């Protein structure tokens, strides 16, 4: 597994083509021989918004840069006051190493 770097920013949570709420994201990218490029990390929004969408399987994140990302909640539970959630990401993620921002000090054991 090779660490590619991270992407972060803001966007809009979308369900069935309808904008739900604004959100931030902070994702890490990895490349494996079998799965290719994978991505996971956190989205942030108000606790009320996250409670409403947590566990749903049809939520997208449209980034302010125009990418459409499919998010799947990877956590089992969400605390009522929690303003972030862990997610796995698919969709229009960067497909090349050069598109990922390297984060200093990050060490990945292989």
What are these regions, as identified by a protein language model?
Residues 32-72:
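Acidic, aromatic-enriched beta-alpha/helix-loop junctions
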Residues 28, 44-46, 90-94:
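Solvent-exposed residues in well-ordered beta-strands and their adjoining turns
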Residues 11-13, 25, 41, 59-61, ...:
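Hydrophobic beta-strand residues in large extracellular and virion-surface proteins
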Residues 50-55, 66, 79-86, 101-106:
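Noncatalytic linker/hinge segments flanking ATPase motor cores
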Residues 88-110:
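C-terminal output/interaction extensions
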Residues 29-38, 76-83:
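Short, ordered beta-strand-loop transition motifs
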Residues 62-95:
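Short beta-strand and beta-hairpin "edge-sheet" elements
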């Amino acid at each position: 597994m090779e660490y590619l770097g991270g992407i972060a920013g803001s966007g809009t949570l979308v369900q069935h083509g309808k904008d739900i709420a604004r959100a931030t994201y902070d994702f890490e990218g990895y490349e494996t021989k079998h799965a290719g490029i994978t991505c996971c990390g956190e989205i942030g929004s108000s606790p009320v918004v996250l409670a409403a969408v947590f566990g749903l399987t049809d939520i997208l994140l449209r980034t302010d840069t125009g990418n459409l990302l499919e998010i799947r909640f990877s956590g089992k539970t969400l605390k009522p006051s929690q303003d972030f959630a862990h997610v796995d990401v698919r969709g229009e993620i960067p497909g090349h190493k050069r598109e990922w921002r390297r984060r200093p000090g990050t060490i990945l054991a292989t």
